[in-house]
């Protein structure tokens, strides 16, 4: 085997293994948790469940990254408050979830109406303890 090809074999093999842990087929994020200081982004086959300290959200489409590692998907977002829940509390609003994935790190931003939250820095397979507002 020529020397330049031999030098690339190990790095390419390592990249293939690492990419397989983050992506399923077609750059769709593989199922599993991504966690930050105040958020857990749980990727599931058909989207994601998002849990914040005082809110919850949902994305109902598989998270497929573009060629730059970005996604921009619609979802829902609902605030949670302290104390007992009342009728109408936590009603889900339309939201926009934008993210960028590079290796095992995700930058996430959530927009609800004119309110922008983030960016949050998340790490694959991290599941932090959230201090809930309940």
Model-inferred region functions:
Residues 37-79:
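N-terminal glycine/threonine-rich, aromatic-flanked beta-hairpin/loop signature
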Residues 28, 35, 44, 57, ...:
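Residues that act as N-cap/strand-start positions at coil-to-secondary-structure junctions
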Residues 57-69, 105-134:
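Edge beta-strand at a domain terminus
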Residues 1-12:
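Bacterial N-terminal signal peptides that target proteins for export
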Residues 28, 43-46, 102-106:
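A short, compositionally biased
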Residues 20-26:
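Sec/Tat signal peptide C-region and signal peptidase I cleavage site
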Residues 26-40, 108, 129-134:
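Tryptophan-anchored aromatic micro-motifs
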Residues 73-100:
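An anionic, turn-rich surface loop/hairpin at beta-sheet edges
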């Amino acid at each position: 085997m020529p020397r330049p090809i031999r030098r690339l074999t190990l790095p390419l093999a390592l990249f293939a293994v690492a990419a397989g842990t983050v992506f399923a087929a077609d750059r769709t994020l593989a199922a599993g948790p991504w966690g930050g200081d105040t958020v857990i982004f749980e990727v599931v086959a058909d989207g994601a469940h998002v849990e914040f300290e005082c809110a919850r959200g949902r994305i109902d489409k598989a998270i497929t990254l573009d060629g730059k590692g970005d996604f921009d998907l619609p979802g829902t977002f609902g605030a949670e408050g302290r104390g007992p829940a009342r009728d109408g509390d936590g009603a889900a609003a339309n939201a926009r979830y934008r993210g960028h994935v590079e290796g095992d790190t995700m930058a996430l931003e959530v927009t609800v109406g004119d309110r922008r939250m983030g960016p949050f820095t998340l790490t694959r397979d991290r599941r932090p303890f959230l201090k809930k507002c309940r």
